[in-house]
A protein has these predicted regions:
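Catalytic domains that recognize anionic headgroups
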Residues: 1-230
């Protein structure tokens, strides 16, 4: 699990042999549908919320269905191509997040919960002669959503134009909930940018961007829909 379980009192990870087999089949046939498993994660999350509704809690949902192009056949709105499967997965996970928000409202937790929605990368579908992620730094791969839902309403919703990185998440969350900052964080708190945007002022400039070269060779085998790494 890449160490994701560190520090958690309860850690659950769904595993499906049927899902793994479907992933193998999809290497030769991009139209093979993967059944989404994030619904199981959501059910466990709601159960956790019900059990801890009267306590302070930290709940982390690592939803992987979009990463795997997996979805429920009850929700697809697009076609069956490779990129359509990705869109179907986004629609599926979006519906699950709607259920999560509904559960928070039902349990009376929404007005005292900070919600953070983030992603670690986008996905390329040939926009710059590449597919997937982790192979270039074009916008389709590096631009990701970051949505902060505080336990109070901001009217209208604030859009922060300043560039941010995922290493900024922890410093931002800690400041928003009133906890001490990390001693030597890699990122910075985005609260100054949020406050500036809320006040209609210019947002502070962030640090510069550094790029790393990944010494891997990528190629495509005839007849296979996905690139391979050498």
């Amino acid at each position: 699990n890449f160490g994701f379980s560190q520090g958690f009192e309860v850690y659950l990870s769904p595993r499906s042999e049927r899902r793994r087999q479907a992933r193998v089949e999809r290497l030769d046939n991009p139209n093979v549908a993967l059944e989404g498993e994030d619904g199981d994660i959501l059910d466990s999350a709601v159960e956790f919320l019900r059990a801890h509704r009267h306590e302070r809690f930290f709940l982390y949902l690592h939803m992987m269905d979009v990463h795997q192009y997996a979805y429920s056949e009850d929700t697809p709105l697009f076609g069956t191509s490779y990129s359509d499967s990705y869109d179907n997965a986004i629609r599926w996970v979006d519906s699950l997040l709607g259920h999560l928000l509904a559960a928070l409202n039902e349990l009376g937790l929404r007005d005292r919960t900070l919600i953070v929605f983030a992603a670690d990368h986008g996905e390329a579908f040939g926009e710059h002669d590449g597919e997937g992620h982790a192979r270039n730094v074009y916008g389709e791969v590096t631009q990701t959503p970051l949505i902060l839902g505080p336990p109070f309403r901001l009217e209208p919703g604030i859009v922060v134009e300043a560039r941010s990185e995922n290493v900024d998440l922890w410093p931002t969350v800690l400041e928003l909930v009133g906890l001490s900052p990390l001693p030597d964080p890699d990122g910075r708190s985005l609260v100054p940018e949020i406050v500036a945007a809320a006040g209609g002022r210019a947002e502070p400039d962030g640090d510069g961007v550094a790029f790393a070269q990944i010494d891997q060779a990528w190629g495509r085998s005839p007849g296979r829909p996905r690139p391979m790494v050498a």
